[in-house]
Structures are given as structure tokens and as C-alpha cells.
Amino acid sequence: MVVKVGVAKLGNIASGVMAELLLDERADREDMQTFMATSGTKLQPEDIDRVVSNMKAWKPDFAIVVSPNGVLPGPTGAREQLAAAGIPVIIITDDVTTKKEWEEVKNSKFGYIIMKADSMIGARREFLDPIEMADFNGNLVKVLAITGAFRKLQLALDKVIDQVKAGKKGTEIELPKIVMTTDKAVDGEFTNDYALAKARAAHEIAIAVAGQNVKGCFMTKEWEKYIPIVASAHEMMRIAAVLCDEAREIEKAGDGILRQPHKKDGVLVRKTKLVAKFE
């Protein structure tokens, strides 16, 4: 059986850059296929409608809806339309900001993976040009990858694929309900305690970036004040990426990097030694 996984990208977060790639890292899996539809950078109704119509036409076994601020009308409407078409939906988004919004997500029929460290960017014109945008996202992808946040996301999605392969469909599928805290991200990722400490620090810094960018983008009006605020947030993310590099180099020095690739049938194999066969 070939499982059809739909990925609807509405706007951009770092998790959306990698969502389908994490499931088929060498493009050689034979047990699943992905279809990605995107609204581009915007969340306008016409952009959302285009994504939803293409996704419904493809008829995936389940769909992943990736967006910033997943409680906005656009992403909310998209997942409601997909669910109405009988497609199980998993939300991947950045941190949900209020208790009311969180309760609505938690009590909904949708699966969710809340990526707390997938922080918003410093989107002030006086600061953010295309290169700054790309640099920030590159640092953030590194943090989410090396801390373990991406692995936990990938494993959760693989479990859903496995359920479909086992014959489950629709409401029979158990969808993930995960808040990606620092504890959850780093769990089982490191053999060296100093590497673990650096990764924890990196993930916590990345979470804190969101607060600074909210302050700089929405709470501060004077340009001479908000420019340094958003710039400082990007410096925080850069340091988080440096800490991740340091953590990985420590793990390399002890020949302890965990590798878990997919086989062609989707089964995960693992090893922790570079020059070694899989366990």
C-alpha cells in the first residue's frame, strides 16, 4: 500500500520548509508519497482556497496543515474544509498564544504538533531583507533539527503513516497531540551531558525569540526602538544555532551521533557509530 500524505503550507514557518522532506530524506520510500500545495507567503482567502481545492482533489489519506499562528481564520478555515471532506488533519504551527486559543485546539478533532521553538521572524521592513530572512530561517532549521524537535515531529507523522498502512482510515486514525517543549525535543538525542545542556539552551533561546519579535513587531511603535529589538532576536537565534553546532561537534567527538534513516518500506533503522552497520 502507498500512503498518500498531503501537506498544505499556508504562509511560512521553519517546520513547513522541512515537513515532507523529513518523511522521505533520500526520496526513495516506496510506501508513501507526498503532495504539497502552498499559498506562498500570504494567507489571503483566495490563496487558501487554491490550496484546499487542490488538496481535496488529490484525496490524501491524511493532511498536514502547516502555518504560522494556526488559530488565524485562514488556517482554521482550511483544516475545517479538509475535515469536512473526510480528510484527517494534523496541525503544525508555532506556539499558541492564549489560553482560550489553546483550549480550542486541544479540544478539537484535529491532531496537532505545536513547535514552541519555531519562533516568528523579526518582520520589520527597516531590518528584514531577503538575506536576513533566509539567514534567520537557516539558523532556526538548524536549531529544530539538532535539538531533536524535527525528529520527534517526523516520528509522530511516521506513526500516522504506519496506521494507514495497517488499514486504518478516517476517524480510526489516532492523530498526534504534541506540544514540543524543550524536554520533549531533546529526549534521547544526546549521549554527552554537555551536548545535552547546549541543546537545551539553544531550544530555550529559540522559544524566547518569539517574545522579542512580538515586542518589536507589534508592541513598539518608534522605529529607532523596534529595530534593535528585532535585531537582538535574530542575534539570539544565531547564538542558538552556534550552540547546536557545538552540541553536535561534542557528539561527533564521542562518535555518538544518532542516525535513524528510513528504509524503502518506511521502516526506521538506527545506529550511533559512524562506521558501523545498523543495529
From Swiss-Prot:
It is an enzyme of class 1 (oxidoreductase). InterPro entries: MTD (IPR002844), MTD_sf (IPR036080). Its EC number is 1.5.98.1. Pfam families: MTD. Keywords: Methanogenesis, One-carbon metabolism, Oxidoreductase. GO terms for molecular function: ferredoxin hydrogenase activity; methylenetetrahydromethanopterin dehydrogenase activity. GO terms for biological process: methanogenesis, from carbon dioxide; one-carbon metabolic process. Belongs to the MTD family. This is F420-dependent methylenetetrahydromethanopterin dehydrogenase. It comes from Methanoregula boonei (strain DSM 21154 / JCM 14090 / 6A8). The gene is mtd.
